[in-house]
A protein has these predicted regions:
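Regulatory modules associated with amino-acid/nitrogen control
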Residues: 1-420
């Protein structure tokens, strides 16, 4: 068709700070492509100010206006382009496919072992560097020893083919040593052995906590565990409507809701999981904190969604996950305080980007140390969840035993995750 791989993704960088950069994707279509693209955009810390999607079922055209959040965030636009190209179906010769297209097999899992002295913000500083290097945290195990030392085990995958050489692994460890400074005792990075490949879960979650965390009626303020009443009331005003009168071949899905981080990714993720095909979509700019989306959709058979039960199920699922894309609660584990964060896993098995980054940033801002942490998977009847456990360390400036302190922690963590 006279196109080269450079034309698949075009990025027109903004010349002024705060103004959006324009990202254009022009490639063959595939099911769930929009979700895959928005996932990468979210992974890079970018906020979509507006967007357009269109496809004829064979060819797809996407244009996104994006800005870094925060504005000070440095973006490697060339790396973003390569990552976006990698998830696009290719019409190119095999030579280019091997270089620029993602492989269908699972990427290798690496184990990063960090042994260091404990200090506030340690896990966030490691996580921040891993994000900058485009290394994705799949699982995490953090332990504090009685003598004040920390053993961090990060199970990571490599998005940029950095770790397949000994030099790349050593260079990554050197970067970490610089970031951690004198508190770093040792750092090792190697391929995770086969004994780690199947370890997705952890100790079971108590039934009473699981019911609260994964319930469809999840409450933002139940038992005083979350203090975001005003935010929740705004989100509950979300409107999700399906109109079958405007188009003879498509259902029009109209969404109006409170703006938040990852909103468009969440909507496209749910659409992908439910087998919804988007023929045309427009994401309007946020006005007074409210977003409007118009999506012309069909079911996986290429038909309008006319069945009332299917309409109700789709609208309910969208409203539920726009209201609670991430679940955040704080509980007591014996004498200790534990923060739990959960989010649905994509049907492809991928978790949500940057959750560890945002949670550890919020805790670092509150001057709270993490005594131990782990990431695992939990299955309920209708979906799989990624669950993050953080056992928090008591400090004199922020006593964790008070109800108000716990509410403040949940409020700060959730606001950071939602971009408020």
């Amino acid at each position: 068709m006279g196109m080269s791989w450079e034309d698949v993704v075009l990025i027109e960088e903004s010349k002024n700070s705060g103004h959006p950069t324009v990202v254009t994707v022009n490639c063959p279509d595939k099911a769930g492509l929009g979700c895959d693209l928005l996932r990468i955009v979210l992974e890079f810390g970018l906020y979509v100010t507006r967007g357009d999607f269109s496809t004829d079922g064979k060819w797809c055209y996407v244009i996104l206006w994006v800005v870094p959040r925060p504005i000070s965030l440095k973006i490697d636009w060339e790396s973003l382009k390569k990552r976006l190209v990698s998830c696009c179906p290719s019409f190119l010769p095999a030579f280019y496919i091997d270089q620029f297209s993602g492989s269908s097999k699972s990427p290798p899992l690496y184990l990063l072992k960090v042994f260091s002295l404990d200090r506030k913000g340690l896990i966030h500083d490691v996580t921040k560097l891993l994000c900058e290097l485009e290394l994705t945290i799949q699982r995490l195990k953090v332990m504090t020893t009685p003598d004040g030392k920390v053993v961090d085990l990060f199970f990571i995958t490599d998005s940029v083919n950095l770790l397949h050489t000994k030099f790349g692994r050593e260079e990554t460890c050197e970067h970490l040593s610089v970031v951690l400074g004198e508190c770093c005792i040792s750092c090792e990075l190697e391929l995770a052995g086969p004994e780690y490949e199947c370890q997705q879960g952890f100790s079971s979650i108590p039934e009473t906590i699981a019911e609260k965390l994964f319930s469809c009626e999840f409450s933002s303020v139940e038992d005083g565990s979350q203090a975001i009443i005003s935010d929740t009331s705004r989100i509950k005003k979300a409107s999700v409507v399906i109109d079958n009168l405007l188009s003879p071949v498509h259902s029009l899905l109209q969404i109006q809701c409170h703006d938040q981080k990852g909103l468009i990714y969440d909507i496209l993720r749910i659409s992908k999981d439910c087998g919804i095909q988007i023929a045309y979509g427009r994401v309007s700019p946020s006005v007074n904190g409210t977003r409007n989306l118009d999506l012309f959709i069909q079911n996986e058979n290429g038909k309008k969604i006319v069945d009332h039960e299917n309409q109700v199920a789709l609208c309910s699922r969208l409203k539920e996950e726009m209201l609670h894309p991430l679940r955040v609660i704080i509980t007591n584990r014996g004498p200790d305080t534990q923060l739990l964060v959960a989010n649905p896993v994509e049907i492809s098995g991928k978790g949500r980007p940057r959750v560890v980054y945002d949670v550890t940033l919020a805790l670092k801002t509150l001057d709270i140390c993490i005594f131990s942490a782990e990431i695992g998977r939990h299955s309920t009847l209708d979906r799989e969840w990624e669950v993050y456990k953080f056992l928090l360390d008591e400090n004199q400036g922020f006593p964790l035993t008070s109800k108000q302190a716990k509410q403040n922690i949940v409020d700060k963590v959730r606001r950071t995750l939602m971009g408020w």
